[in-house]
Amino acid sequence: MMSNRSDFIVPDEAAVKRAASVNFHLEPLRPWLDDPQITEVCVNRPGEVFCERASAWEYYAVPNLDYEHLISLGTATARFVDQDISDSRPVLSAILPMGERIQIVRPPACEHGTISVTIRKPSFTRRTLEDYAQQGFFKHVRPMSKSLTPFEQELLALKEAGDYMSFLRRAVQLERVIVVAGETGSGKTTLMKALMQEIPFDQRLITIEDVPELFLPDHPNHVHLFYPSEAKEEENAPVTAATLLRSCLRMKPTRILLAELRGGETYDFINVAASGHGGSITSCHAGSCELTFERLALMVLQNRQGRQLPYEIIRRLLYLVVDVVVHVHNGVHDGTGRHISEVWYDPNTKRALSLQHSEKAQ
């Protein structure tokens, strides 16, 4: 019996051509896309590729991967998924023909003359619980405890001893979330850049700012993202600090460095920090360490989703997520100049809040 022609799915010729165009533009990356040991393929700028293998980054020079080719890859990918990527919509999230997830950022949302491409390869690895047990997966589970960890005790001892340089250095190395607060002209950005120098050079860093200030000459695996200073999430601007924060989650950052918290993007920053991306550093305007938490809470309330949360919940989240607040001041009138006036670090309060929530949940 002959089957009815309607039983067959006729391939869409146009879709096949669009997929072929994407695959053609991916050819310079094919050696790493086809390598089963590589999980992530990143292009930060023309001519260079960073790949993640066994949780370590590898660098490769690819001279034929020029700017025009990367622009064409973005255009082909956008057509394949029936989306747009352009100067007015410079961020694209998509799934490639072979199932890889891709994130593309082009100018003006990144540095002029560069394009950021992040490709995450799907994992086909299957493990049983027995496999996990043999690999020691369950050997390091720590029960909830009121006791501080050795690292927390170390940081607290440095702070109480007044060794603030060593305290800040270790806080960065231990991937604590740090907020630098102070008034305009107090030196927040300059201190942020000093803290960034303590980040290990092999980590992948992504900065978000409206004006290029957070330079990373010693960290080769980095991407600088930019948003217009007048862009507002509430007005549905295509590129804002908040949209770039969300984009970061698809770009495999080790750390996210946001130049300044000014409004509703604070909600997204807290979300990102709470999702396990430790080591983030940012700044805000505030008159003291305690007022920093008030300012952050008020800025969370400027977000559509954030304002749905009770103020007490927002404050609690901030104390759980933010590890260190450094307040800087410019003593113009008393002649003290720019200096750190306060440092907040209170792991005991953080632990108590966490345990309190855990006990209520039980």
Curated annotation (Swiss-Prot):
InterPro entries, per database record: P-loop_NTPase, Sigma_54_int_dom_ATP-bd_1, T2SS/T4SS_dom, T4SS_GSP_E_ATPase, VirB11
A biological process from GO: secretion by the type IV secretion system
Gene3D superfamilies: 3.30.450.90, P-loop containing nucleotide triphosphate hydrolases
Main location: cytoplasm
Cellular component, GO, one term: cytoplasm
Keywords for this protein: ATP-binding, Cytoplasm, Nucleotide-binding, Virulence
SUPFAM superfamilies membership: P-loop containing nucleoside triphosphate hydrolases
Compartment(s) of residence: Cytoplasm
Family: Belongs to the GSP E family.
Family matches, as PANTHER family: TWITCHING MOTILITY PROTEIN PILT (PTHR30486), TYPE IV PILUS RETRACTATION ATPASE PILT (PTHR30486:SF6)
Name of the protein this chain belongs to: Type IV secretion system protein VirB11
